[in-house]
From Swiss-Prot:
It is a peripheral membrane protein. InterPro entries: COQ7_proteobact, Ferritin-like, Ferritin-like_SF, Ubq_synth_Coq7. Catalyzes the hydroxylation of 2-nonaprenyl-3-methyl-6-methoxy-1,4-benzoquinol during ubiquinone biosynthesis. It catalyses: a 5-methoxy-2-methyl-3-(all-trans-polyprenyl)benzene-1,4-diol + AH2 + O2 = a 3-demethylubiquinol + A + H2O. PANTHER family: 5-DEMETHOXYUBIQUINONE HYDROXYLASE, MITOCHONDRIAL, COENZYME Q10 BIOSYNTHESIS PROTEIN 7. This is 3-demethoxyubiquinol 3-hydroxylase. HAMAP family: COQ7 (MF_01658). Its cofactor is Fe cation. It is found in: Cell membrane. Keywords: Cell membrane, Iron, Membrane, Metal-binding, Monooxygenase, Oxidoreductase, Ubiquinone biosynthesis. Pathway: Cofactor biosynthesis; ubiquinone biosynthesis. The gene is coq7. It comes from Stutzerimonas stutzeri (strain A1501). The keyword Transmembrane helix does not apply.
Length: 215
């Protein structure tokens, strides 16, 4: 049986830098799955509808940027190899969401948020800090974050124009994936965060959504 490769701290830092560039540079993330929107018919949206949907998808794209950074930060400081591997696998799966959202934003004639580098840095720091405290807290943070993302996606699904099948297909698949990530994190030993902590996280997420809807 081949032995598991052990990376040096320098190797891991280079891997983190590569992950950051693949997350932040346009069209650099290569999805492993085709977009759920691929076979859906493009709706005839009014200018205001297209602008609103683009704003929603921009929020979701930035949310995926934050998820990438969170997972990469946690993978850097995770104590147990299996937790580190789980974080890296989750980050790989989120690349699909990142690419799908960006594709849809471009189709709508809009742009990703210029604030993404800032949110990436903040989320990476939070993820690394959680990993330093304990793997249980790190996994619990993943579960709580994914629960927040699911709530945002439910809200956005309710705001989409009825005929926008492309955006709806993307968000529905993302919703399914994020719920699975949350469940997997708890089953792996993640701590269930109390309601006050989740409330604080929701306030922080509102800052992100307000800021990235337009810019």
């Amino acid at each position: 049986m081949p032995s598991q490769r052990h990376y040096s701290p320098a190797d891991r830092l280079l891997m983190q830098a590569d992950a950051a560039l693949r997350t932040l540079l346009p069209f650099s993330g290569q999805p492993s799955r085709p977009s759920p929107a691929l076979l859906k018919t493009e709706a005839e949206l009014s200018e205001s509808e297209a602008r609103h949907v683009a704003g929603l998808m921009r929020i979701n794209h930035t949310g995926e940027v934050c998820a990438q950074a969170l997972y990469q930060g946690q993978a850097l400081t995770a104590r147990l190899p299996q937790v580190r591997q789980a974080m890296e696998q989750a980050a790989d799966e989120e690349i699909d969401h990142l690419a799908w959202c960006e594709q849809r934003i471009r189709q709508l004639g809009s742009h990703t948020s210029v604030l993404n580098p800032i949110f990436y840095g903040l989320s990476f720091g939070i993820g690394a800090s959680a990993g330093l405290i304990s793997d249980r807290i790190s996994l619990g943070f993943v579960a709580a974050t994914e629960d927040q993302v699911c709530k945002h996606l439910d809200d956005h699904l309710g705001q989409l124009p009825a005929g926008d099948e492309k955006s709806r297909a993307i968000l529905e698949q993302m919703r399914e994936d994020e719920a699975q990530h949350s469940t997997a994190a708890i089953e792996a030993g993640g701590l269930r965060f109390p309601a006050p902590v989740k409330f604080g996280m929701s306030l922080v997420s509102k800052v992100m959504t307000k800021a990235t809807y337009r810019i």
